[in-house]
């Protein structure tokens, strides 16, 4: 292994850093002193590029990606990477990794770029302790902070990803996202057709949607904090067409919709498991779109929510659900034998809510006194049959 140092040299006609990379032997370590180095680098051999000062910047010329990696076993450490191109189709990024393995990007800062880190068919690589943001545009015109495509067995840990558009995983399996912070993004983590991923101990705040899962299998979401999604329709967790989905030990607070679950009426066997979560202070704790089936909801705490359960179109609560041993602060039953379990089930019905199931414009009057009165009258003397949308057969009588 060779180690050599490179100091910043200003030149209009040469790129000393690219020259150093071209001349470096495999597994060389290139150490950079403070300064601004030209970007648009192409790395095609295993090397380590490390900043040994606090102000080592690799700056692109505003065209293409700042660093493109075509070799496995490349490490980037302690760098500021900035000023990519702006071509959305070409996915201009701070760092673009292309069909590589065993790479590492750690303790880097990414700013003023279109995309942050683009991982295209990358395996067994690590993105660790980076601060990633993108150029300040309208959120729909920003690029993703992190993009994984056909990328497997990677570790994304300890990063702060903020003020980007999305973080996406497409066709990407067996990845670990752990101890990251996601703030001020659109879809903070969006997994689509990606299986056996683990999201653990991450923190989400001020995103439009915290987590989104579409067409995923065998995914585990463990001990995350999903808080304060923004906007009137801000969603903490959005779940659609998932199977063997485990959601355990999470805290979901201060969202318009805590957990939004889309279940197709004809879909069966899409198992979802919600255990030991705290779902609190949301406008809607659980929002179901269409049918309510194949859910196991046990040992959770629901408190401080405006509505515990809502359903926005037709669909039944059927016997495939297992709902028990949850704490609901609205439960008004008794515990005669003192075993901590309510003597009667906790049932949630739709009364006046049925009106906006047929006409969503009616929800404009959601908190109006006339709707509250109508809801009270329907409970007192129902003249239309209410829908049972949730039944906890063994509700916890007091918080546990």
Q: How would you name each of these model-derived features?
A:
Residues 32, 43, 51, 58-60, ...:
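Extracellular beta-strand solenoids
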Residues 38-50, 57-103, 114-122, 148:
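Extracellular beta-strand-rich solenoid/capping regions of secreted or surface-exposed proteins
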Residues 230-232, 236, 245, 258-265, ...:
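Functionally critical loop-and-helix segments that line ligand-binding/catalytic clefts
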């Amino acid at each position: 292994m060779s180690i050599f140092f490179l100091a910043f040299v200003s030149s209009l006609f040469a790129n000393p850093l690219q020259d150093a990379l071209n001349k470096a032997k495999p597994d060389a370590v290139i150490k950079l002193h403070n300064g601004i180095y030209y970007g648009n680098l192409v790395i095609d051999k295993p090397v380590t590029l490390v900043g040994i000062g606090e102000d080592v910047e690799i700056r692109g010329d505003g065209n293409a990606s700042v660093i493109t990696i075509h070799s496995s076993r490349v490490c980037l450490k302690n760098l500021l990477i900035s000023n990519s191109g702006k071509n959305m189709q070409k996915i201009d990024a701070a760092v673009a990794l292309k069909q590589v393995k065993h790479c590492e990007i750690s303790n880097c800062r990414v700013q003023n770029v279109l995309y942050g880190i683009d991982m295209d068919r990358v395996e067994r690589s690590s993105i660790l302790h980076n601060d990633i943001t993108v150029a300040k545009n309208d959120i729909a015109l920003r690029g993703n902070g992190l993009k994984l495509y056909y990328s497997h067995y990677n570790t994304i840990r300890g990063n702060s990803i903020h003020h980007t558009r999305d973080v996406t995983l497409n066709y990407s399996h067996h990845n670990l996202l752990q101890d990251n912070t996601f703030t001020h993004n659109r879809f903070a983590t969006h997994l689509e057709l990606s299986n056996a991923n683990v999201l653990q101990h991450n923190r989400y705040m001020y995103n439009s949607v915290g987590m989104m899962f579409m067409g995923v299998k065998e995914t585990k979401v463990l001990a995350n904090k999903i808080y304060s999604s923004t906007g009137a329709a801000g969603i903490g967790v959005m779940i659609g067409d998932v199977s063997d989905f485990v959601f355990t030990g999470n805290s979901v607070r201060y969202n318009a919709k805590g957990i939004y679950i889309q279940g197709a009426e004809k879909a069966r066997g899409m198992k979802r498991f919600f255990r030991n979560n705290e779902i609190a202070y949301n406008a809607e704790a659980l929002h179901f779109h269409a049918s309510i089936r194949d859910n196991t909801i046990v040992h959770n705490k629901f408190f401080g929510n405006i509505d515990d359960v809502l359903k926005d179109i037709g669909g039944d609560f059927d016997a495939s659900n297992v709902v028990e041993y949850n704490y609901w602060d609205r439960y008004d039953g008794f515990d005669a034998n003192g075993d901590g379990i309510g003597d009667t089930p906790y049932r949630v019905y739709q009364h006046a809510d049925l009106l906006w199931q047929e006409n969503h414009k009616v929800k404009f009057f959601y908190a109006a006194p006339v709707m509250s009165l109508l809801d009270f009258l329907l409970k007192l003397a129902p003249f239309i049959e209410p829908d049972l949308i949730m039944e906890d057969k063994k509700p916890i009588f007091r918080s546990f």
